[in-house]
Every structure is written in structure tokens, then in C-alpha cells.
Amino acid sequence: MAPKLMVGLALLLAAACQAPGAPTTCNTQIDWVNFVQVGSTQYVAKQQPPTPLQQSDLGAVYAHVKFKVSGNVCDPNYRLKDGDAAFLDAGTPIYQINGQPAIEQLAARFDGRILVYTAMGPAS
């Protein structure tokens, strides 16, 4: 009887563990806004200007996305980190906008367009 109990417990334990490399499953769905976190400042893509930005409007690369949270984070208590973005892939460059202070606005390419991200202040 003891060997059967041990086998049963081992099977139960194995079923409860996740295999390395297996996709994670979330019980919580987060509805992300289109943001990028640079340092302690969160920038959000709000309504875009009537005239879309062009390549010539972009200044120097200011930062790069380090981590895409959408599809990878399901903890509603997750604390944003420098380089996090909702929908931009890791490695995406974040640009300064010519004539705009970086503390107010930045830009990035998303879904075939150049979007303006407006500073919302330090993240909590």
C-alpha cells in the first residue's frame, strides 16, 4: 500500500509542477494601456497629433525597450521597471522628438506608425 501511495503522491506533485519552458497560464487578464517606462517616468500614447510624426521629427535614440509586459505579465501587482513597455517589443528604440524635451514626450515606432508617448510622471 505504501508504494502505491508514494507513486500517487509523486504523480500529484508532478502534475502540479510546470515543465521548464512551458508557456505560463494566467488566471488574470490585464488590460494594458500603450505605455513605455523610462527611468521612473511612465510615458503613455494618448490621442495622436493631427499630423503624424515623420522620421525627420525624430531625434536621437533616448532608450530601448527591455521587456514587453503584454502577454508576459499576469500579476496585477507587477511593479513597472525601467525599460518596460506594454506592446513594444524588447529592443525597440525610443526616440527624442526634435524640439520637445524628453521629460515631456518621446516617440517610438508601433504598428507601422510613429507614436508620441507623453510623460505621466513617476510611476508608483
Question: For each of these PLM feature ranges, what is it?
Answer:
Residues 107-124:
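C-terminal partner/receptor-binding element of secreted or periplasmic proteins
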Residues 23, 29-31:
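Transition segment at domain starts
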Residues 31-99:
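Mature extracytoplasmic domains of secretory-pathway proteins
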Residues 52-55, 104-105, 124:
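A short local loop/turn or secondary-structure capping micro-motif enriched for an aromatic residue
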Residues 96-99, 104-112:
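Short, exposed beta-strand-loop hairpins at the edges of beta-sheets
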Residues 1-6:
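Bacterial N-terminal signal peptides that target proteins for export
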Residues 13-16:
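C-terminal motif of bacterial Sec signal peptides marking the signal peptidase cleavage site
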Residues 18-20:
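Bacterial signal peptide processing site
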